[in-house]
Curated annotation (Swiss-Prot):
Protein name from the UniProt record: Elongation factor Tu, chloroplastic
Residues that, per the record, bind Mg(2+): 26
Provenance organism: Gracilaria tenuistipitata var. liui
InterPro entries reported for this sequence: EF-Tu_GTP-bd, EF-Tu_GTPase, EFTu-like_2, EFTU_2, G_TR_CS, P-loop_NTPase, Small_GTP-bd, T_Tr_GTP-bd_dom
Phylogenetic classification of the source organism: Eukaryota, Rhodophyta, Florideophyceae, Rhodymeniophycidae, Gracilariales
Residues binding GTP, per UniProt: 19-26, 81-85, 136-139
Function: GTP hydrolase that promotes the GTP-dependent binding of aminoacyl-tRNA to the A-site of ribosomes during protein biosynthesis.
Region (G5): 174-176
Length: 409
């Protein structure tokens, strides 16, 4: 079956939901999708389609990042629903890294919770530039002053992590009540229900406050591989989000990292199940590669314009080590510490060979909550550049976050 063409009419923005588990991130994602589908007369993604991760549903946890698309009058959005559970911070790092802006969901009934703080911190570290706040479950709060108190607390928390807490738009509402209304009447328009209107107000705030990103289209092409699969009779497809540049069918690219660098040609491009002539920075895309076996390519490699990025094992970085309260280590570490470095889409084991305090003074050990400059050496070479962000993880939890300040080897 020939695939329909993806039409590029409006500016495209990647956003996502972040916040504490059970504060209503997935319900809000479904409510936005349904509300805008009703207004634009298109088909929405249902809650259970968004939250679909069968292997983890048994434990009542959302894992996997679900991608939903929807449109406002002004823009086309790709929305990532980030997992809200601390065990899956790893996925949040891949998910949140794909956001031009985020909707922070906070239950008005509970106020900010530990993961609210953790997600704000992560958003800062993975470089999510802008945040809009949705105070959910407003129907459960009778006291207007309580709502104002929660807003104040969240604003202070945002300021603490260097977001402009005083300027960030806040919208209160109920994702569940809005979703129920749209489910009853799937052609409901703005002005017909107060809860549905609050979702429209939220998207007005997102439209206005989260700037259309200046895409890195002019830069050289780079995409980190998230997943790889074979299509019988057609070859191997690598999927991921184009970090920068433009890619066209017929272009030659390099596959860099983890193994010897190899070169291949692009034979096809797809997005949202539709074929494309070219993909550009910000697109979540599937790239069909000529003459590449599924076993030759894996998550964590990057596809790049030939000669523009090289694999490295040693670098210097500015790093923040999480406190115990933020879900980090409880004890200090010393040089020779061997954690995993989570870079773009993969974990690589490495050794922290030396470090100094952030002011350059000598340090014997690193305490939770410290900011340090450090040198690291990885066991496998991966595509690294100056200014690139990464997480430091051990035993499945994030213990630090950093940015590469210099490449050594």
């Amino acid at each position: 079956m020939a695939r329909a063409k993806f039409e590029r009419k409006k500016p495209h923005v990647n956003i996502g939901t972040i916040g504490h588990v059970d504060h209503g991130k997935t319900t809000l994602t479904a409510a936005i999708s349904a509300t805008l589908a009703a207004a634009n007369d298109t088909k929405a993604k249902k809650f259970d389609e968004i939250d679909a991760a069968p292997e983890e549903k048994a434990r009542g946890i959302t894992i996997n990042t679900a991608h939903v698309e929807y449109e406002t009058q002004n823009r086309h959005y790709a929305h990532v629903d980030c997992p809200g559970h601390a065990d899956y911070v790893k996925n949040m790092i891949t998910g949140a890294a794909q956001m031009d802006g985020a909707i922070l969901v906070v239950s008005a009934a509970d106020g900010p919770m530990p993961q609210t703080r953790e997600h704000i911190l992560l958003a800062k570290q993975v470089g999510v530039p802008n945040v809009v706040v949705f105070l959910n479950k407003q129907d459960q709060v009778d006291d207007e002053e309580l709502l104002e108190l929660v807003e104040l607390e969240v604003r202070e928390l945002l300021i603490q992590y260097d977001f402009p807490g005083d300027d960030i738009p806040f919208v209160a509402g109920s994702a569940l009540l809005a979703l129920e209304k749209v489910t009853e009447n799937n052609s409901i328009q703005r002005g017909e229900n107060e809860w549905v209107d609050k979702i429209h107000s939220l998207m007005d705030a997102v439209d206005e406050y989260i700037p259309t990103p200046v895409r890195d289209v002019e830069k050289t092409f780079l995409m980190a591989v998230e997943d790889v699969f074979s299509i019988t009779g057609r070859g191997t497809v690598a999927t991921g989000r184009i970090e920068r540049g433009i890619i066209k069918v017929g272009d030659t690219i390099e596959i860099v990292g983890l193994r010897e660098t190899t070169t291949t040609t692009i034979t096809g491009l797809e997005m949202f199940q539709k074929t494309l002539d070219e993909g550009m920075a910000g697109d979540n895309i599937g790239i069909l590669l000529r003459g590449v076996q599924k076993k030759d390519i894996e998550r964590g490699m990057v596809l790049a314009q030939p000669g523009t990025i090289t694999p490295h094992t040693q670098f210097e970085a500015e790093v923040y080590i999480l406190t115990k309260e933020e879900g980090g280590r409880h004890t200090p570490f010393f040089s020779g510490y061997r954690p995993q470095f989570y870079v773009r889409t993969t974990d690589v084991t490495g050794t922290i060979t030396q470090f100094t305090a952030d002011d350059g003074s000598a340090a014997e050990m690193v305490m939770p909550g410290d900011r340090i400059k450090m040198s690291a050496e990885l066991i496998n070479p991966i595509a690294i550049e100056q200014g690139m962000r990464f997480a430091i993880r051990e035993g499945g939890r994030t213990v630090g976050a950093g940015v590469v300040s210099k490449i050594l080897e």
